[in-house]
């Protein structure tokens, strides 16, 4: 009897221990929040806040409700914690590939199948080997003239001799043309146009519910990616021939560099791998920049005093150039106020709304337990539109970026840490060259004064930002 009693006590202690362990793993110590509907979680609320033009509402409502800068939810089929604020940004960016790693939804992995064959850390190392020189400021200097030339052609064909234009399709064409030229040395407008339409279909369905049925955005995105990939493989095969025959330079663009770079074992990437990586770069170098350029036009149209200061700065540079003389790196460095304006646009309408990470192990943050495998979402708006980081956050004020600028980890349109966008300086160049030729040629006004903004996944004007143009009476 006594032995039975001891056994029962041992079983009871064991069961209590299991229960306590289960509680820790399944809820106790987790951030506050709810997981929403089965399967969908809170994904529809998360996405619909963007469709309504206020993606920050999903974040701010829950921060206020739970009185916490960390909360749990269920997004895109995954249990997730949302991290908000500068300290959260610092924690995530500082622990990249230690406690967390980049994570993409299944829709992205299915569009880029090669990304599932290696770890996120290995992919990051590969890409940084592939792009050691192209995006460095000293390397980008030699591309300023090419950017200037293409930008002039863009305005000549898409803007000049028109009373009205729709801005967003034009900025998409502009940034895509630049990316094709500088990444692939593809410059023929007909060849670029062949990529452009399927590329738009791909971008719009990339972050979507991964239902692969005919007619769904995800299904259309997969078809578009397959078409683009075949075209890229054709370009890659021809480039290999041209490199072998010495017809092209080994350093003329990213494609040549990728073809000639091997890993530590002497292995070169296959054609499909390179096509996937070029495709990813085209998305990063095209969609985000086109959104940024469109919103720069929007704010310049709404704020005449800001436009006038940008115009004055750019005309001083224009007047220093001889007939037909292209912009140079030194001219870009003089565009300080223009870049402050661009940064304020990136604060108020960041093309990158946020990004996901995956917990590599259990860890604690702000007193909360984050289990291994959970997804973590950081939001740019959690600092960009908070009074404590940017006083009067809805006010357009480029002076925020004068001197030392915003506090660390508060202005994050390009991410941060090891995963910071490698094309940050490239984006600065294409944005400033665009601003130079825009204000040098035109004054303009919005045709729809209160046009709705949609965020899906980047902010875009619902009607494309129709504009009425008033050309300046001087030679551009």
UniProtKB/Swiss-Prot annotation:
It is a single-pass membrane protein. Its cofactor is heme. One of its GO terms (molecular function) is beta-amyrin 28-monooxygenase activity. Its EC number is 1.14.14.126. GO terms for cellular component: membrane. InterPro entries: Cyt_P450, Cyt_P450_CS, Cyt_P450_E_grp-I, Cyt_P450_sf. Keywords: Heme, Iron, Membrane, Metal-binding, Monooxygenase, Oxidoreductase, Transmembrane, Transmembrane helix. It catalyses: beta-amyrin + 3 reduced [NADPH--hemoprotein reductase] + 3 O2 = oleanolate + 3 oxidized [NADPH--hemoprotein reductase] + 4 H2O + 4 H(+). Heme binds at residue 421. The chain crosses the membrane at residues 2-22. Disulfide bonds: none annotated. It is found in: Membrane. Specifically expressed in roots. Belongs to the cytochrome P450 family. This is Beta-amyrin 28-monooxygenase.
